């Protein structure tokens, strides 16, 4: 079959179960596409040809023995922030260019246990710090919809790989929008779960109180299959929550749209910089949900203007602490011929970290310094609590909250944006991480440049099933999630 990459995750799993094709054939099909197309997209940092085929053969043997799970033999790819035993894990940085993890991240372990086949590791902004995937030491990833545009970030490689049909689904991480914004830019469905729902063990840390792993795929149904694999308590992660996990696939039609109250924050649709076409597509999608039975309710989120300054104090502060371990002594990049220990530290970090990572470490170190700790970091944590309370108050009257996922569609690679302009592009996504809430991006149309627009739905704690169900039902009645990027259509 030449069009295996056009099938959904469910169709791939059913095809394997019915012996329409083998996991080896399916895996080889994707590897061939990667070899053919990815030189243009640059979504993969590492392609694991031999290991993938070995995993596929093992999956086929399990099926023949009658011991396979539903997803056994389906391929996926991991963001290069999840540790993979025996495979390079770089976090997109020169600092970890030669790091081979001695263990698997829990997310990778769960994927392996489900019989999923790892195609490789996906490009990302360095240490997940960025919104474009341009800060990667391995070069910028291109948006499959327009190769001169960014795919978003930091999970840009994950989004680009799925959008170009170089993987059926992929893992991502989200610290301030790093699943939802690239999903929006690349026309995908992407879910950021409640903080603590997915294990962070073996996931290289950026900002520990904000980071959360999640799935990226074409549809809510495909995301639900990967969430069933990823979610759950992990004793190795002290922030993982002991709470029963839903069957996200079984619950895809469980949420009634009739009477569902969707909050429309008046502040969100009056943000300076919100593109008129993005606003129009999002409003059209909300009208469609209204036609399907939902009720739109205007709400007030008075803390909106505090999102960006609060996030860009807390996240860099945590990054400053987390990245202090990369000193050129124990592991990571080490400079050549240091004069003394201080020179080793300074040069290893200056040469090993890129400009954006250095910028955030400096901001974070300043915010944590003795004279400014109370004025900046402690105050930001107090405002963070107010942001959380703002959301909880809103959820007393509505079931979910709607917003654009990003104020614009994908911009040009190399666009002359200042760091502040780049940070303001995260206005709609940051608060979800500050509050620890779940949120999902759904593709809802294209702009006049044929670039995807995304709708973000924010849920109350532990409402991942509800979010997936709403988007799934929307996708049963629309075709935006089935539209394919130019490079995927050209190489169908």
Curated annotation (Swiss-Prot):
Task: Offer a single GO CC term for the protein.
Answer: glutamyl-tRNA(Gln) amidotransferase complex
What is a GO molecular function of this protein? glutaminyl-tRNA synthase (glutamine-hydrolyzing) activity
Q: Does the keyword Nucleotide-binding apply?
A: yes
Q: What class of enzyme is it?
A: ligase
**What EC number(s) does the entry state?**
6.3.5.7
Q: Which residues form the active site?
A: 79, 154, 178
| Pfam families cross-referenced by the UniProt entry | Amidase (PF01425)
Q: Which InterPro entries match?
A: Amidase (IPR000120), Amidase_CS (IPR020556), Amidase_dom (IPR023631), AS_sf (IPR036928), GatA (IPR004412)
User: Which keywords annotate this record?
Assistant: ATP-binding, Ligase, Nucleotide-binding, Protein biosynthesis
GO terms of biological process kind: translation
What this protein catalyses is: L-glutamyl-tRNA(Gln) + L-glutamine + ATP + H2O = L-glutaminyl-tRNA(Gln) + L-glutamate + ADP + phosphate + H(+)
Query: Function of this protein?
Result: Allows the formation of correctly charged Gln-tRNA(Gln) through the transamidation of misacylated Glu-tRNA(Gln) in organisms which lack glutaminyl-tRNA synthetase. The reaction takes place in the presence of glutamine and ATP through an activated gamma-phospho-Glu-tRNA(Gln).
What family does this chain come from, according to its entry?
Belongs to the amidase family. GatA subfamily.
Cite the record's note on assembly: Heterotrimer of A, B and C subunits.
Any idea what this protein is called?
A: Glutamyl-tRNA(Gln) amidotransferase subunit A
Annotated organism of origin: Acinetobacter baylyi (strain ATCC 33305 / BD413 / ADP1)
The gene name reads gatA
């Amino acid at each position: 079959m030449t069009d295996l990459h056009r099938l959904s995750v469910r169709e791939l799993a059913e095809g394997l179960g019915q012996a329409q094709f083998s996991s080896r054939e399916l895996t080889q099909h994707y590897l061939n596409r990667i070899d053919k197309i990815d030189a243009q997209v640059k979504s993969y940092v590492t392609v694991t040809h031999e290991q993938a085929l070995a995993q596929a053969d093992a999956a086929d043997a399990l099926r023949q023995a009658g011991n396979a799970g539903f997803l056994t033999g389906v391929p996926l790819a991991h963001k290069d922030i999840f540790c993979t035993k025996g495979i390079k894990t770089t976090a997109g940085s020169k600092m970890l260019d030669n790091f081979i993890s001695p263990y698997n991240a829990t997310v990778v372990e769960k994927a392996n246990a489900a019989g999923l086949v790892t195609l490789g590791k996906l490009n990302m902004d360095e240490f997940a710090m960025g919104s474009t995937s341009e800060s990667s030491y391995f070069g910028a990833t291109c948006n499959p919809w327009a190769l001169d545009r960014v795919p978003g970030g930091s999970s840009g490689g994950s989004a680009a790989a799925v959008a170009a049909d170089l993987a059926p689904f992929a893992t991502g991480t989200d610290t301030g929008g790093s699943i939802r914004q690239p999903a929006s830019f690349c026309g995908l469905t992407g879910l950021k779960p409640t903080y603590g729902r997915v294990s962070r063990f073996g996931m290289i840390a950026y900002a520990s109180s904000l980071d959360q792993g999640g799935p990226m795929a074409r549809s809510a149904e495909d995301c639900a299959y990967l969430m069933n694999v990823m979610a759950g308590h992990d004793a190795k992660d002290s922030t993982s929550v002991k709470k029963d996990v839903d069957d996200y696939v079984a619950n895809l039609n469980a949420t009634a749209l009739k009477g569902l109250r969707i909050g429309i924050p008046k502040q969100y649709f009056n943000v300076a910089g919100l593109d008129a076409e993005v606003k129009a597509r999002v409003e059209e999608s909300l009208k469609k949900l209204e036609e399907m039975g939902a009720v739109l309710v205007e709400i007030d989120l008075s803390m909106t203007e505090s999102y960006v300054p609060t996030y860009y104090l807390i996240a860099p502060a945590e990054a400053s602490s987390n990245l202090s371990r990369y000193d050129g002594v124990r592991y990571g990049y080490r400079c050549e011929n240091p004069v003394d220990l201080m020179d080793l530290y300074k040069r290893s970090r200056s040469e090993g970290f890129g400009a954006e990572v250095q910028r955030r470490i400096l901001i974070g170190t300043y915010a944590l310094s003795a004279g400014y700790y109370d004025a900046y970091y402690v105050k930001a944590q107090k405002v963070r609590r107010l942001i959380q309370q703002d959301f909880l108050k809103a959820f007393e009257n509505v079931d979910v909250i709607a917003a654009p996922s990003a104020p614009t569609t994908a911009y040009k690679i190399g666009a002359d944006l200042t760091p502040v302009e780049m940070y303001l592009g995260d206005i709609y996504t940051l608060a979800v991480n500050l509050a620890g809430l779940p949120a999902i991006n759904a593709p809802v149309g294209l702009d006049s440049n044929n670039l995807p627009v995304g709708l973000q739905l924010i849920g109350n704690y532990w409402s991942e099933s509800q979010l997936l169900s709403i988007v799934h039902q929307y996708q049963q009645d629309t075709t935006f999630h089935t539209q394919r990027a130019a490079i995927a259509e050209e190489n169908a």
